[in-house]
Design a protein with these regions (language model features):
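Residue-level marker of positions within ordered structural domains that often coincide
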Residues: 11, 33, 79
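C-terminal charged interaction modules
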Residues: 65-94
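Short, charged/polar N-terminal "headpieces" of proteins
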Residues: 1-19
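Acidic, aromatic-enriched beta-alpha/helix-loop junctions
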Residues: 16-53
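Mid-chain, well-packed structural core segment of small domains
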Residues: 49-68
Length: 94
């Protein structure tokens, strides 16, 4: 997973040399942008410094299947209210 602070932005999966990546619904990028503005992190260096990746996790299936499944889970786990609360806290989950 790729995050800006605590906001997920992309799912990545791999198996050997095979890789897959899935962007999330545009509301996640909109939340990243709004949280960055709220936190005052509008210059490139500070904005880029907040991106991080999580540890890889094992999942069954091909990288494409795993990425699709995890992306669907993330989109279901992050309601509009949850994202709004994270944005209001400058991109950090309470």
């Amino acid at each position: 997973m790729v995050f800006w602070r605590d906001i997920p932005a992309q799912v990545k999966a791999r198996q050997g040399r095979e890789r897959a990546a899935r962007g999330l619904d545009p509301r996640f990028q909109e939340a990243v942008d709004a949280a960055a503005m709220r936190a005052g992190l509008t210059d490139t260096d500070h904005y880029l410094a907040e991106w991080r990746t999580s540890a890889w996790e094992e999942r069954p299936g091909s990288p494409e299947q795993a990425a699709d499944q995890r992306a669907a889970e993330i989109e279901a786990e992050y309601s509009a209210e949850r994202l709004r609360a994270i944005v209001e806290n400058g991109g950090k989950e309470l």
